[in-house]
């Protein structure tokens, strides 16, 4: 098999196999071929991983942030040196086109290691509080053993986005990738240990929906960070609440992308396409509700249709390919069902709407699809599809579109295209979302916080803000004089 790892799990600095676990077959989404066969973690494997993390963490926490940072920066360098190899593995794992993975996946993970490796002393600083003769100070201390649970759309990136802040803050991590994309995180663990990370600090175990509760409910776990769906988030939050664990969650979205009539139309069309079709639409922050002001709707749709129909669908390993397959057959069937629902509920099909005929019949392909004349009540305008399906809605004025944009249980992200920057700032101030773009979309460099509100989660990935979620504040009061007691 072309991508078979040495073993299913990476624990305490080495590969570990346990064939008693349920078999997980990794399939190449472009062909359905089995490229690796792994095993889900048994309870014994979960215990082994958490025990390794718990044992290694105190000594790691005692190191200086600068020393920890040097290791992360070495890992970043190794990832960049092996970008092609890692990108090809990511394409095999996810089906995303190599033209995307080579610029957006391992490189983003390397950026996270470099960023957190370089900012640790400043990001973990406390404060001094003068209190007259006395004073107090605060310091940030690690939480202990952290669990990361990844999604299948950006497996390598997510492993790094969670691992980097956890490690630099002095924690140990047990990371569980999605069973759909089990391969990339193992390579990240390899690279971290090659860079000098002590054993036991970054462990990877495979698993399915039965494995997560073993991690979340474990008494030695201090914090859980999840990237996933809203239903999964609710289950994890409920389980973690029983032992008052720290929790951060980056969940789903149904984000609005608003195009006003003074916007640069080609840029707005490009933003809408990036916000719906990148990674075959499998991006949580996608602006899948595209609100277009009525005066430009016809021209917007004309340009959008032409550019969408010109996209190249095909072999993800071909650098010319722009649209690859969905991650799995089940996800393809889900997306196709939503497309049929859009047709049945009366939306106007502008482009796509079916299965492309120029690709392997065994692959999990869906055409990039655009619907117009979508209303707020339609299923495709309310529910997260997680595929290349764009809904175009029209609007008259600013107040109307803000009200409609906010009428969603989700609040992950949103965007505004307009030449009027005063209006742009006014609109984003009123949008109920955690991450917003003006005249851009879906750009998420590690220097800025990323996360949502409402049902889209809480907490932030990346930036110095992430360190607050992997540490806690300790306050120390220092008395400088005699203690006066009233008795």
UniProtKB/Swiss-Prot annotation:
Cofactor(s) the protein requires to work: K(+)
E.C. number(s) listed in UniProt: 1.2.1.8
InterPro entries: Ald_DH/histidinol_DH (IPR016161), Ald_DH_C (IPR016163), Ald_DH_CS_CYS (IPR016160), Ald_DH_CS_GLU (IPR029510), Ald_DH_N (IPR016162), Aldehyde_DH_dom (IPR015590), BADH (IPR011264)
Modification sites for Cysteine sulfenic acid (-SOH): 284
Superkingdom in the source lineage: Bacteria
Keyword entries, A-Z: Metal-binding, NAD, NADP, Oxidation, Oxidoreductase, Potassium
Record GO biological process: glycine betaine biosynthetic process from choline
Transmembrane helix in keyword set: no
Pathway involvement of the protein, from the record: Amine and polyamine biosynthesis; betaine biosynthesis via choline pathway; betaine from betaine aldehyde: step 1/1
Catalytic residues as annotated in Swiss-Prot or TrEMBL: 162, 250, 284, 461
Entry keyword Ribosomal protein: no
Residues involved in K(+) 1 binding: 26, 93
Xref: Pfam families: Aldedh
Annotated binding of NAD(+), by residue: 150-152, 176-179, 229-232, 252, 284, 384
Binding sites annotated in the UniProt record for K(+) 2: 244, 454, 457
Cofactor note: Binds 2 potassium ions per subunit.
Gene Ontology MF: a single term: betaine-aldehyde dehydrogenase (NAD+) activity
Catalytic activity: betaine aldehyde + NAD(+) + H2O = glycine betaine + NADH + 2 H(+)
EC primary class: oxidoreductase
PANTHER family the UniProt entry points to: ALDEHYDE DEHYDROGENASE-RELATED
Family: Belongs to the aldehyde dehydrogenase family.
Function: Involved in the biosynthesis of the osmoprotectant glycine betaine. Catalyzes the irreversible oxidation of betaine aldehyde to the corresponding acid.
SUBUNIT field: Dimer of dimers.
Protein name: Betaine aldehyde dehydrogenase
Source organism of the structure: Rhizobium etli (strain CIAT 652)
């Amino acid at each position: 098999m072309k991508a078979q790892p040495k073993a299913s799990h990476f624990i305490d600095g080495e590969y570990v196999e346990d064939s008693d676990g349920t078999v997980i077959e990794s399939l190449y989404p472009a062909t359905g071929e089995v490229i690796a066969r792994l095993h889900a973690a048994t309870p014994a494997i979960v215990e082994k991983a958490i025990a390794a993390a718990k044992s290694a963490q105190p000594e790691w926490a005692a190191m200086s942030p600068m020393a920890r940072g040097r290791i992360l920066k070495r890992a970043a360098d190794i990832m960049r040196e092996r970008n092609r190899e890692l990108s090809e593995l990511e394409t095999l794992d996810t089906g995303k086109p190599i033209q995307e993975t080579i610029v957006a996946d391992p490189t983003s993970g390397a950026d996270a290691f470099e960023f957190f490796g370089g900012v640790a002393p400043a990001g973990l600083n406390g404060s001094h509080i003068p209190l007259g003769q006395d004073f107090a100070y605060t310091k940030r201390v690690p939480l202990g053993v952290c669990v990361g649970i990844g999604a299948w759309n950006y497996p390598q990136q997510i492993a790094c986005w969670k691992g980097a802040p956890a490690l630099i803050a002095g924690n140990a991590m047990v990371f569980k990738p999605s069973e759909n994309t089990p391969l990339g995180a193992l390579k990240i663990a390899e690279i971290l240990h090659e860079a000098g990370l002590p054993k036991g600090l970054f462990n990877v175990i495979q698993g399915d929906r039965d494995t997560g509760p073993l991690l979340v409910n474990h008494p030695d776990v201090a914090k859980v960070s999840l990237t996933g769906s809203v239903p999964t988030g609710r289950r994890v939050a409920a389980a973690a609440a029983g032992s008052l664990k720290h929790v951060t969650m980056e969940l789903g979205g149904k984000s609005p992308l608003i195009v006003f009539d003074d916007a640069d139309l080609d840029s707005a069309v490009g933003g809408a396409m990036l916000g719906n079709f990148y990674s075959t639409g499998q991006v949580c922050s996608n602006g899948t509700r595209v609100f277009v002001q009525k005066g430009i709707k016809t021209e917007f749709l004309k340009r959008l249709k032409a550019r969408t129909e010109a996209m190249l669908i095909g072999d993800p390993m071909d650098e010319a390919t722009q649209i690859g397959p969905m991650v799995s057959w089940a996800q393809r069937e889900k997306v196709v069902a939503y497309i049929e629902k859009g047709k049945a509920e009366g939306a106007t099909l502008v482009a796509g709407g079916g299965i492309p005929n120029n690709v392997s019949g065994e692959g999990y392909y869906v055409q990039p699809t655009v619907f117009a004349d979508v209303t707020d009540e339609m299923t495709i305008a309310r529910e997260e599809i997680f595929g290349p399906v764009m809904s175009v809605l029209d609007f008259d004025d600013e107040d109307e579109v803000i009200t409609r944009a906010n009428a969603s249980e989700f609040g992950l992200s949103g965007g505004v295209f307009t030449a009027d920057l005063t209006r742009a700032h006014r609109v984003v101030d009123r949008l109920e979302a955690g991450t917003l773009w003006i005249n851009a979309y879906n750009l998420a460099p590690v220097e800025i916080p990323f996360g949502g509100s409402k049902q889209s989660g809480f907490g932030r990935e990346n930036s110095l803000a992430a360190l607050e979620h992997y540490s806690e504040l300790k306050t120390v009061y220092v008395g400088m004089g005699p203690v006066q007691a009233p008795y």
